[in-house]
Amino acid sequence: MIYRLSDEYYVRPLAPADLDGPYPGWFEDQDVCRYNSHGKLFRTRAYFREYLDSLKLDDRVVWAICHERDGHVGNISLQEISPIDRTAEFAVLIGDKRHWGKSLGLLAGRQLLAHGFRKLNLERVYCGTAATNEGMKKLAAKL
C-alpha cells in the first residue's frame, strides 16, 4: 500500500529496510526530538527491530513519509487505536530536516486521517503536544 501525496512525496508502511537508513539516527537529534520523549534515551538497533515487529501485533498504524529522491524522511502514525471508542492519537515526526517547512505533516496527515476515518471507522482522532510546539498546534488546527 502506497499513497501518493504529491509529485515528490508518498507514504507507505514502515518497513524493516528503514532500519538501515537514517531513521534510527533521528532519535539522537535533539532538534528533531525537541517536542517528544524519543530523544531522551539512547536507542539500540534491537530496540527499533522490536518496535517494528510490534507493529504487526498492536493498535498502531505507522507510515514512512518518503521523498522520491531522498527516501524515508519522516513517520506519521495513528497510535492508541481504540476499536471500542473508535478513537486514535495522531503523531508525526519529520526526521530529515531538509524536509522541514514543506507541509509534509499536513499532506501526510490528511491521507492518514482519511485512512483512519474511512478504513478504520474512527470517529475521533486527537493529538497531544507541548504548549510551545507551535508547528503541531497549527497542524492540528488545519487538520
Regions found by a protein language model. Give the residues of each.
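Short loop/turn motifs at secondary-structure junctions and domain boundaries
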Residues: D53-D59
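An amphipathic alpha-helix signature
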Residues: P16-P24, R45, R49
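Short, flexible helix/strand-to-coil boundary loops that buttress conserved ligand/catalytic motifs
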Residues: W26, N36, S103
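Short amphipathic alpha-helical segments and helix-helix/interface helices
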Residues: L52-D53, K137
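Conserved GNAT-fold acetyl-CoA-binding loop/helix
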Residues: D31-Y51
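Acyl-donor (CoA/ACP) binding surface of acyl/acetyltransferases
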Residues: M1-L19, D29, V62, C66-L143
